[in-house]
Amino acid sequence: MPAPVVMVIGTASSVGKSTLVAALCRLAARRGLRVAPFKAQNMSNNAAVTADGGEIARSTAVQAAAAGIAPTVAMNPILIKPEGQRRSQIIVEGRPWQTLAAGDFWRRKTLLWEVVTRNLDALRATYDLVIAEGAGSPVELNLKAGDIVNMRVAVYAQARTLLVGDIDRGGIFAQLLGTLMLLDPTERQLIQGLIVNRFRGDPALFVDGVRILEERSGIPVLGVVPWIEDLGLAEEDAVAIEQSTPVMAQGITIAVIRLPTIANFDDFDPLAREPGVTVRYIDRPGELAGVAAVIIPGVKHTIAARRWLRERGFDEALRRFPGAIVGICGGYQLLGERISDPLAVEGNGGDEVGLGLLPVETIFVTTKQTTQTVAHARVPWGGQAPLHGYEIHMGRTHRIGAASALLTIIQRGAQAVLEEDGCISPDGRVWGCYLHGLFTNDEFRHGWLRQLGWQPTTSVSGSVDPINRLADHVARALGETVLDRLFRLTE
């Protein structure tokens, strides 16, 4: 018999679906259930790499970690990676499928329904419970005919479905009741409960709100989840970095350039969680004032990002910048002398002069490198421990002359290798590499921060697992009885 499915849908994007699924995965795993997350289709440039080299959304990989299992492509069989100019690379079952304009994908997406059901069925045959996540709103009426991620999944799996609204953005009654009103009757009958998320203050003050929602909908409110600060889990959408933070008077501030089609910006979450470190996202050269370091992040379209940097006036600003300059993946490519795309891998192709801050050149090829990777640092402050991360890139970068490498790669997937990666300037101020997840490695992160003059204000070890913190928070809001019924441990 296929495993039951619990599904979390939301009234809009960024209402907390991903974090709630992560919490439920951890809470189910604590009860001894073999549980897996599932999201049929995701749109994000924040990608993770599975053990077999497939790509899935990082938010799904976090949910798998919450469940205590390794992520697989079955958990997120369709990943849309926007490239700009209304085009996206479509990843199907972990591998590049096609690069399509929005209209072309819309016309073809219903063909992918079989991919969705095949992978969901495989998870249901393997695990005791699957916790699925929707995307955006399930009642975008102009898009509903092509739905392969929201209520079509719920109906197919006959899922116990939860509807989540975000009270912090206001209009919680319109959010929840309006969504219910627009669902088809066969869809509405699957809704087992409502969740009011991100309540600031005492939830007891919303007792009347709970009563109104239950009276008008006939559906129980399973919990009012209070706002939780500084959770530190990977964000799915770039909307999470739209609000910048000021340069702090104490500690150090690191600027990350908010490039168009920025990718894998959760690379910098470990830096932001350190005491005495502020990470701010910038898009103007004037915002470099007072920061200790600037990071050029990964990006989905490197040549377009290069032109954007030039148009914004970053070329001269970065050349004059006295602090540390770092590039990760696409950012590493941008730091070099030249970027070439003779096969139009990124769309229109072309050839661009880089920022010229590192003696490297990049050429794009049609084969995508997607691996879980282990490396050693070749710099004294990088520590002795192996560095664990992942690679996702279609560029091949080589150093010019006697330039020094930053890392030695010793393993890709299950294969032992011995290959240099990255580059560092003679004075150590400018460096870059392809390894995402570099700053999750404590020795490397702390070593680099100390190079910037960082002095931790509290202990840098023994932090609480953010997933456990989140799970405890959600468990308090929903209660053990609700959770047991949801997971079908009791009826």
Curated annotation (Swiss-Prot):
For whether the record's keyword set contains Signal, the answer is no
Q: Which UniProt keywords apply?
A: Cobalamin biosynthesis, Glutamine amidotransferase
Q: Which GO terms describe its molecular function?
A: ABC-type vitamin B12 transporter activity; catalytic activity
Question: What pathway does the annotation place this protein in?
Answer: Cofactor biosynthesis; adenosylcobalamin biosynthesis
Q: Tell me which residues make up the GATase cobBQ-type domain.
A: 251-444
Q: Name one GO biological process term.
A: cobalamin biosynthetic process
Name of a matching Pfam family: CbiA
Specify the signal sequence span: none
Q: What positions does UniProt annotate as the active site of this protein?
A: C329, H436
Query: Which family does the record assign?
Result: Belongs to the CobB/CobQ family. CobQ subfamily.
| Function per UniProt | Catalyzes amidations at positions B, D, E, and G on adenosylcobyrinic A,C-diamide. NH(2) groups are provided by glutamine, and one molecule of ATP is hydrogenolyzed for each amidation.
| Protein name stated in the entry | Cobyric acid synthase
Q: Which organism is it from?
A: Chloroflexus aggregans (strain MD-66 / DSM 9485)
Q: By which gene is this protein encoded?
A: cobQ
